[in-house]
């Protein structure tokens, strides 16, 4: 499979594995009876450069937030999947992406791209989606970084 964003060939497993992991998180979350303002889904290799606590950003309970990334496609038909934050219902919709793959791809015509699939899962909330730019001095990814192989990079 070719990923247009990175211009690389990626395996289907690279998309399906995280979607299945999120499905399992959703299975656990559905059973949880605790009431929280926000639930956060994040990759294990992501960090951010900010001395500000997330709640100091004035997050609204009915909004959906994700990590900032520069580009015209984001929040139009893609969601950056490094860090995602929302109420239980929104996070459960994301966690349900794996179970809805056939519908999303075959019936709805969404490409096998987790950025597009996540946006499609939450499209009804488009007007309440925001990207969280934790450090505007980093223009590409707003202070969000990958931590891999002993290096820290924005992409």
Where are these regions (language model features)?
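ER/Golgi luminal nucleotide-sugar-dependent glycosyltransferases, focusing on the catalytic module
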Residues: 1-155
